[in-house]
């Protein structure tokens, strides 16, 4: 049975990382596509491909294809056009791929009337300052993320994907009126952060005024997923 809501805009994206398609569909059939969008990442896309995406679209769900594209500009151009041909709602691309790659991604969407939202990945929520230092990045995490956000804005991406803790700093330096912010790593108080080092609660996400939040394991691994979703929605 679908959940009822007065929400006009989808602002919750549920991350599907199932290895079993039947288990995924059992979970999905309880969701209302007018409330929730679905995120398909590397696991499910590799296992079930475009066929699975089309099944979800027929059910009315908007799809965020989270493959975090990162390649040379020419390859990205073709990949993003392929995504657009699938009527995908949102797609992710690594900002660190560079200005030319990002411009190529934007140019690839020019012929399309219904363009997917092009969202730039800043850094993975599993990384912290120590990890970045080992990669040779010596400036602070906040400065690095802000630098990437500015590049994404300059290249006319539709928005960025970043930790909630960085949003206030980004909003001080970038006009985010038409620039979407998506925050992953959402956890309820008391829940394990698993492998994510930069997590945000639903209440904080509301305070940060983000446009979209990604909910994953705290729901899909819950003994009562619908009750957990209702709790999250009550906090935003």
From Swiss-Prot:
UniProt key word Lyase:
yes
GO CC list: cytosol
**What pathway does this protein act in?**
Pyrimidine metabolism; UMP biosynthesis via de novo pathway; UMP from orotate: step 2/2
User: Which reaction does this chain catalyze?
Assistant: orotidine 5'-phosphate + H(+) = UMP + CO2
Membership in a protein family = Belongs to the OMP decarboxylase family. Type 1 subfamily.
Q: What NCBIfam families would the database entry show?
A: PRK00230.1 (NF001273), pyrF (TIGR01740)
The identity of this protein, by name, is Orotidine 5'-phosphate decarboxylase
- The gene that this protein is the product of is pyrF
């Amino acid at each position: 049975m679908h959940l009822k809501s007065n929400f006009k805009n989808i602002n919750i994206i549920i991350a599907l990382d199932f290895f079993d398609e039947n288990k995924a569909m059992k979970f999905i059939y309880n969701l209302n596509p007018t409330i929730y969008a679905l995120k398909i990442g590397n696991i499910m896309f590799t296992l079930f491909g475009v066929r699975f995406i089309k099944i979800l679209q027929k059910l009315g769900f908007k799809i965020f294809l989270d493959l975090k594209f990162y390649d040379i500009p020419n390859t990205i151009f073709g990949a993003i056009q392929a995504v657009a041909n699938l009527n995908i709602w949102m797609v992710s691309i690594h900002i660190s791929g560079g200005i030319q790659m990002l411009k190529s991604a934007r140019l690839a969407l020019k012929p399309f009337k219904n363009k997917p939202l092009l969202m730039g990945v800043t850094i993975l929520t599993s990384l912290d300052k120590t990890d970045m230092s080992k990669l040779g990045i010596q400036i602070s995490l906040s400065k690095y993320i802000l630098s990437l956000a500015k590049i994404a804005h300059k290249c006319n991406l539709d928005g960025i994907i970043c930790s909630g803790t960085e949003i206030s700093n980004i909003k001080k330096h970038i006009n985010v009126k038409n620039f979407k912010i998506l925050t992953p790593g959402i956890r309820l108080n008391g829940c394990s952060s698993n492998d994510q080092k930069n997590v945000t609660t639903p209440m904080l996400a509301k305070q940060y005024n983000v446009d979209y939040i990604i909910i994953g394991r705290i729901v899909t691994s819950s003994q009562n997923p619908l009750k957990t979703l209702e709790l999250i929605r009550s906090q935003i």
